[in-house]
């Protein structure tokens, strides 16, 4: 299923973080915070400085979670994006 964000929004797939600490302790899923980084999957036509495939950091409480084809995504407003990782 294709999803085209409208307005000044982007569709993001969260980047999974490691499930163990530096000392090797396994962190259970319910104890982990959701990552604040992701990869841009789709961009609205109004946004020109962010492209598909960009890695971004976003605000902790920003965005709306959606599920498409059994995958979880986040729809973010442009204002919730903190920066592009290069």
Swiss-Prot record:
Keywords: Chaperone, Cytoplasm. CDD domains: cpn10. The keyword Cytoplasm applies. InterPro entries: Chaperonin_GroES (IPR020818), Chaperonin_GroES_sf (IPR037124), GroES-like_sf (IPR011032). It holds the Pfam family Cpn10. Heptamer of 7 subunits arranged in a ring. Interacts with the chaperonin GroEL. Together with the chaperonin GroEL, plays an essential role in assisting protein folding. The GroEL-GroES system forms a nano-cage that allows encapsulation of the non-native substrate proteins and provides a physical environment optimized to promote and accelerate protein folding. GroES binds to the apical surface of the GroEL ring, thereby capping the opening of the GroEL channel. PANTHER family: 10 KDA HEAT SHOCK PROTEIN, CO-CHAPERONIN GROES. This is Co-chaperonin GroES. The lineage of its organism: Bacteria, Pseudomonadati, Campylobacterota, Epsilonproteobacteria, Campylobacterales.
